[in-house]
Amino acid sequence: MSSKSKFVRRQRIKRRVRSVVSGTEQRPRLTVFRSLSHIYAQLIDDVNGHTLVAASSMPSKGASLLKGKKSDVSREVGKALAEKAKAKGIDAVVFDRNGYRYHGRVKALAEGAREGGLKF
């Protein structure tokens, strides 16, 4: 499967899922973006169009770079996202895997968020 057809497939799945899955302020949408070297996760309120909480494996100012296997780093990102969400009073989310298969880093991030206390 060429990279273009993979991209087109993911975009088609993404549109189809987005028409059904929607986040609110009480139960935001947890969306995942996966690049070759990093992973990003956001809690989005689709009603107002705002990102409520975000976490990534990309180091921010003053933060250290997460080391280890990509799936282990993804699990830590999920836990960090859950901590930030708990601080904002969010405990339930709707999971949007963004067209990616529920496998590997996406699965590890979801499990980390569950370990951190998020329900979905």
UniProtKB/Swiss-Prot annotation:
GO BP terms, alphabetized: translation
CDD domains: Ribosomal_L18_L5e
Keywords: Ribonucleoprotein, Ribosomal protein, RNA-binding, rRNA-binding
Assigned GO CC terms: cytosolic large ribosomal subunit
GO molecular function, one term: structural constituent of ribosome
The protein's assembly and partners: Part of the 50S ribosomal subunit; part of the 5S rRNA/L5/L18/L25 subcomplex. Contacts the 5S and 23S rRNAs.
Role: This is one of the proteins that bind and probably mediate the attachment of the 5S RNA into the large ribosomal subunit, where it forms part of the central protuberance.
Family designation: Belongs to the universal ribosomal protein uL18 family.
Protein name: Large ribosomal subunit protein uL18
Naturally occurring in which organism (per UniProt): Chloroherpeton thalassium (strain ATCC 35110 / GB-78)
